[in-house]
Each structure stands twice: as C-alpha cells, then as structure tokens.
C-alpha cells in the first residue's frame, strides 16, 4: 500500500512538491518533461488570449471552443514573480539582449550587449509585454522549464516559443496569475 512518488503530484494546497524550492529543484533536471499539448479550457478569456499561471509554471494560449494550447514555462524566482495584465507590444525573431541596469547591478559579469543567436538567453523569439522589461521569450536553457528561475520574464523552450510566436499578434492580451 506504499504511496509512490508519482502519486504525490496531485494539485493539493498543502503538497510541497507542487510549487516552491522542492518543485524547482525537481523540475530543473527534466528535459522538456512538459510537452506542449491542446487541453480543455474552461476560462472566460477570449480566443487569442495568453494566460500564464506562475504557480503551475504553465502558459495557455486560448484557442476557443473550450480549448487552449498548454506550454511548460519557467517563471520569476522568489522576489521576481509578478501578476497582472499586459499586452504584447512588440515581437522579435532572434532578439538582441541588453541586460537591464538592475540585473547588471546583481551580475556585473554579464555582457552589456549580446547579439541574437543560439547563445543568447532570450532564445529564438521574444514577445515584449507592455512598456515593462518583461518578455515571453525562448531560452538556451530548456532544462529550466517548470522552474521559478528567471528575473520575471516568462521563458519557454525555443521550439515552443516559435510555435506561440507564430500564433500571437501585437496587441494580444497577456494575463499573468499566481
């Protein structure tokens, strides 16, 4: 009657494996263990809306007809997570990266500029959110999907961000929930 680890993953409020440092530690070692898939959607959001659940480490692109595409994502680590509503104000393929001043203060070893490419932390695509420094972007660290490790951006595998990028238009509503 032993309860195996696999049975502990249910979405219950008191389960330490659902979120937090333990979940981050366990999820960081999985290689794309969060496959993109079409799932049932019961929310009231209109088709074309992006909904991010930081607690689930998932991004949903609402298709309509009671369906959404679900992606695994990396989210802001403790002290860097946020919630609210933004819209996609710009899209870029293989974006250049300029770390913000706050990040450079924490990490003076970072380059001041990095051209777009496979080594760039923004990955293959970026969708800029409002006038903030936040983005939904690809990543050259796919092993971080499912973890809270970023400085507030929503990161995706490059394969998934290309798929989402092709679906999204400038002006798309983005809702981020905890």
Can you describe what each PLM-predicted range is?
Residues 81-83, 151, 169-171:
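Short edge beta-strand segments in beta-sheet-rich domains
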Residues 1-13:
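Sec/Tat signal peptide C-region and signal peptidase I cleavage site
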Residues 113, 154, 159-178:
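N-terminal targeting pre-sequences for secretion and organelle import
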Residues 33-35, 143-152:
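Short, basic/aromatic beta-hairpin or loop at an interaction surface
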Residues 1, 15-31:
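Short N-terminal segments immediately surrounding and downstream of signal-peptide cleavage
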Residues 24-139:
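Gly/Pro-biased beta-strand-loop elements
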Residues 71, 138, 145-147, 165-166:
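Short histidine-centered beta-strand/loop micro-motifs
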């Amino acid at each position: 009657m032993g309860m195996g680890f696999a049975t502990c993953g249910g979405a219950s409020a008191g389960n330490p494996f659902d979120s937090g440092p333990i979940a981050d530690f366990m999820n960081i070692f999985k290689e794309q263990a969060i496959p993109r898939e079409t799932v049932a959607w019961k929310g009231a959001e209109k088709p074309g809306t992006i909904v991010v659940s930081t607690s689930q480490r998932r991004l949903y692109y609402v298709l309509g007809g009671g369906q959404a595409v679900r992606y695994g994502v990396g989210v802001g680590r403790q002290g860097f997570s946020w919630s609210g509503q933004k819209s996609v104000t710009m899209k870029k393929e293989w974006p250049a990266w300029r770390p913000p001043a706050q990040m450079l203060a924490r990490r003076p070893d970072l380059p001041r500029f990095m051209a777009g490419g496979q080594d760039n932390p923004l990955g293959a695509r970026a969708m800029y959110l409002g006038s903030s420094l936040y983005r939904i972007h690809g990543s050259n660290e796919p092993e971080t999907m499912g973890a809270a490790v970023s400085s507030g951006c929503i990161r995706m595998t490059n394969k998934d961000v290309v798929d989402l990028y092709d679906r999204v238009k400038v002006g798309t509503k983005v809702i981020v929930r905890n």
